[in-house]
Design a protein with these regions (language model features):
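PLP-dependent amino-acid enzyme catalytic core
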Residues: 1-269
Length: 269
């Protein structure tokens, strides 16, 4: 797992954009190309290895694959919970199998119902669970600490990042500290792009004491399951989330004065 992922320079409409390549945290073979894994591993540090860990992995998510590997490294038995379907990624299941995890199949249903079923199963069987969307202070602090090193070196006017559920982006935004900076005479702006409800993201940020008029949440016109496979990005970029954020930046870059950093959380396989 590569912790010190690079910041690269990429061109967008004859403009230089800094790109944090957190997708390079995993190699796409042993681990998924995903910048969340250092934070997830920080959560595992505080688990009791005597008890198994179960996690619900929805189709398209790399969480089950990542946890199967990270838990194996820490001697924690991992149970991969999922609802089988014709479209569920066999590639991801096979990657998890390579790490000798156990599988717990569920009947397909709404996400909230599936999560409650897994939670009930865990309580009955003395099995550990991680917070939904990894929403825990240890996870967010890990992201913040890693981002601190980035923003010490790269003083930018705009941070562009996929909102996701609001959890991962919140740790990075806390580090960036948007708004007026009296020392540099700047007004740093955050632009997060969501595929869901804008107010949901603002509420998540508010729950983590992040509230600023310098945070702008925009909803993409593309649906969640539109992977934008025909849209070209100059680096590996996840179609579910990050690709939509880069497309947003391509449409809006002329309105953003100053230096821009795009935080790429996930690549593609």
């Amino acid at each position: 797992m590569l912790l010190e992922t690079p910041v690269e320079h990429h061109r967008l409409k004859n403009r230089n954009i800094l790109v944090k390549r957190d997708d390079l945290m995993g190699d796409g073979q042993t681990l998924p190309p995903w910048g969340k894994m250092a934070g997830i591993d920080a959560l595992l540090e505080n688990l009791n290895p005597k008890y198994p860990l179960i996690h619900l992995a929805v189709n398209g998510s790399w969480s089950g694959w990542a946890l199967s590997y990270l838990c194996k490294q820490r001697g924690i038995k991992f149970i991969y919970a999922y609802a089988p379907s014709k479209t569920y990624s066999q590639f991801i299941l096979d990657k998890a199998k390579e790490n000798d995890c156990e599988f717990h199949e569920l009947k397909p249903n709404m996400m909230a119902i599936l999560y409650n079923r897994v939670n009930s199963y865990a309580k009955k069987n003395d099995i550990q669970m991680l917070p939904y969307a990894f929403d825990h202070v240890d996870y967010r602090n890990n992201l913040k600490q890693r981002a601190d090193e980035v923003f010490k070196e790269h003083l930018v006017d705009h941070l562009v990042i996929s909102a996701g559920s609001g959890v991962t982006s919140s740790g990075i935004i806390q580090s960036y500290q948007p708004g007026n900076d009296l020392f540099s005479n700047s007004n740093k702006q955050v632009h997060t792009i969501t595929v869901s409800n804008i107010n949901t993201i603002y509420e998540k940020y508010k729950s983590h004491s992040i509230a600023s008029s310098a945070i702008n949440v925009d909803k993409t016109k593309y649906e969640f399951d539109n992977m934008m496979i025909d849209y070209e990005v100059p680096f590996p970029c996840n179609g579910t989330w990050d690709r939509k954020a880069w497309w947003w930046l391509e449409q809006k870059e002329s309105q953003l004065n100053g230096d821009i950093l795009f935080w790429n959380i996930g690549g593609n396989i």
